[in-house]
């Protein structure tokens, strides 16, 4: 190991050492478009199985937002990652976990049925909505983004990460319908598109979000973050729709 190489220390379980490989690169599109936040990469903690994607959200909430702000905040966590879910349950008195595919998942604690395109929640109900790598799976992404915006309170933050390409415009084909076709087009059988970074920001802003782009690798690289993955902090501010 070189003197400059970052040593991984898992923020969830405290493991120190090398990360494990995760993901797959069976379909060339992920490499061809240099998709960030997807594909084969060294990113899984061998002890608690946390991934770079959930550690990124954790890093923002713990190191940037600060945990004390979470205590009395209303938090909605869609498709909850186990380690992040456990941590949020320990920090927030008002945490709700939800997913539209309860039968296919193994969760920690209570998880409610929630369709992010049509939720049962009131306008402006949540201070935080965490929907990490979910929007890319939804056919009507604009409807989902509008629904998150509706239930997010003014001054609230939505974390709406998706796989990103920076070398192509957004890839989305109306004639791609089957799992096999989606695998070839987008790299995953359940994805509906691959977003370009600038296209995605414009989409978020068109819904009404104020978007701040952060890269937390410098300063927190030891948490095993993806150096290339930017965090899109989506805020609902006064004066927007």
Where are each of the predicted segments found?
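Activation segment
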Residues: 104, 120-123, 138-139
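PRPP/pyrophosphate-binding module of the type I phosphoribosyltransferase fold
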Residues: 130-132, 143
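Short catalytic micro-motifs in class I SAM-dependent methyltransferases
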Residues: 133-137
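S-adenosyl-L-methionine-dependent methyltransferase catalytic module, highlighting the catalytic core
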Residues: 3-8, 12-15, 139-148, 153-240
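A short acidic, Gly/Pro-enriched loop at the edge of an enzyme's catalytic core
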Residues: 116-129
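Hydrophobic beta-strand segment of the Class I
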Residues: 78, 129-130
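Conserved N-terminal segment of class I S-adenosyl-L-methionine
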Residues: 1-118, 215, 219-241
């Amino acid at each position: 190991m070189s003197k400059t190489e970052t040593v991984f220390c898992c923020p969830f379980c405290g493991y120190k050492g090398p990360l494990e490989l995760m993901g797959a690169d069976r379909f060339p599109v992920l490499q061809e478009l240099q998709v960030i936040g997807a594909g084969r990469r060294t990113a899984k903690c061998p002890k608690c199985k946390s991934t770079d994607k959930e550690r990124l959200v954790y890093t923002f909430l713990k190191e940037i937002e600060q945990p004390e702000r979470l205590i009395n905040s209303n938090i909605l966590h869609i498709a909850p990652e186990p380690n992040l879910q456990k941590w949020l349950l320990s920090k927030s008195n008002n945490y709700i976990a939800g997913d539209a595919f309860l039968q296919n998942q193994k969760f920690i604690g209570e998880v409610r049925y929630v369709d992010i395109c049509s939720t049962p929640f009131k306008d402006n109900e949540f201070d935080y909505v965490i929907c990490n790598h979910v929007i890319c799976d939804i056919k009507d992404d604009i409807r989902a983004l509008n629904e998150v915006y509706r239930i997010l309170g003014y001054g609230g933050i939505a974390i709406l990460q998706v796989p990103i390409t920076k070398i192509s415009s957004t890839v989305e084909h109306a004639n791609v319908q089957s799992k096999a076709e989606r695998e070839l087009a987008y790299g995953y059988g359940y994805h509906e598109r691959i977003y370009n970074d600038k296209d995605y920001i414009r989409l978020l802003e068109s819904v009404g979000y104020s978007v701040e782009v952060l890269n937390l690798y410098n300063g927190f690289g030891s948490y095993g973050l993806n150096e290339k993955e930017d965090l899109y902090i989506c805020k609902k501010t006064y004066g927007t729709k």
